[in-house]
Amino acid sequence: MSGGSTGERPFSDIITSVRYWIIHSITIPSLFVSGWLFVSTGLAYDVFGTPRPNEYFTQDRQQIPLVNDRFSAKQELEDLTKGL
């Protein structure tokens, strides 16, 4: 199979270029820091709607919110979320 050139730079040329490492030495750490801030500030809980670790169990509801019967799951979920 003799394939032609796609006109793209070889990967080895890209990762050995100085420009690649200048760009990525800034972007990779900044992505890490922004992800850490997203989680550590609690914004991830607000964006995705998940409860914070201290909100899983309230004073009124100390049992595990578990659905037991798949055919009456809607009613069980309504009962579990009634006090929220």
From Swiss-Prot:
Subcellular location per the Swiss-Prot or TrEMBL entry: Plastid, Chloroplast thylakoid membrane
Highest taxon listed in the record's lineage: Eukaryota
Keywords: Chloroplast, Electron transport, Heme, Iron, Membrane, Metal-binding, Photosynthesis, Photosystem II, Plastid, Thylakoid, Transmembrane, Transmembrane helix, Transport
Sample GO molecular function, one term: heme binding
SUPFAM superfamilies assigned: Cytochrome b559 subunits (SSF161045)
Residue stretches spanning the membrane: 22-36
Cofactor binding note from Swiss-Prot or TrEMBL: With its partner (PsbF) binds heme. PSII binds additional chlorophylls, carotenoids and specific lipids.
Name of the featured protein: Cytochrome b559 subunit alpha
Organism (species): Phaeodactylum tricornutum (strain CCAP 1055/1)
Taxonomic path: Eukaryota, Sar, Stramenopiles, Ochrophyta, Bacillariophyta
Gene name of this polypeptide: psbE
